Amino acid sequence: MAKKVEAYIKLQVAAGMANPSPPVGPALGQRGVNIMEFCKAFNAKTESMEKGLPVPVVITVYSDRSFTFVTKTPPAAVLLKKAAGIKSGSGRPNTEKVGTVTDAQIQEIAEAKAADMTGADIEAMKRSIAGTARSMGLVVEG
């Protein structure tokens, strides 16, 4: 018989840096999940990623307190900030531009996020990411 799903927990955890402190500890602790077991498994799975990059993770907790988790790709905004070499987006995106990204960089981000995005094709994903870039105050070249 299949295990009964008790909860889904969605978190954003820095790649390779999961530890029992908030937000991981309290979210898993209240469900009775072994926090250190999750931290070790998550850090092992994300060791190939750039350390510190926020990674969305969906944890499925079962009635016997076991768990499974699925990692997603980092948010588009984080990847865009990294590509443009900026710390944060613009407070006034339509008037104050803070950086530029090229069409090639947007293509690269769209390909990286293709597994998580539900866009029909790569062009639709590129348009979505370009829109995110513009809303952050980035100039899209190309």
UniProtKB/Swiss-Prot annotation:
Modifications made to the protein after synthesis: One or more lysine residues are methylated.
Keyword Coiled coil among record annotations: no
Pfam families named in the record: Ribosomal_L11, Ribosomal_L11_N
Keywords: Methylation, Ribonucleoprotein, Ribosomal protein, RNA-binding, rRNA-binding
PANTHER family (alphabetical): 60S RIBOSOMAL PROTEIN L12, LARGE RIBOSOMAL SUBUNIT PROTEIN UL11M
Entry's family note: Belongs to the universal ribosomal protein uL11 family.
Official protein name in the record: Large ribosomal subunit protein uL11
Species of provenance: Vibrio vulnificus (strain YJ016)
Gene coding for it: rplK
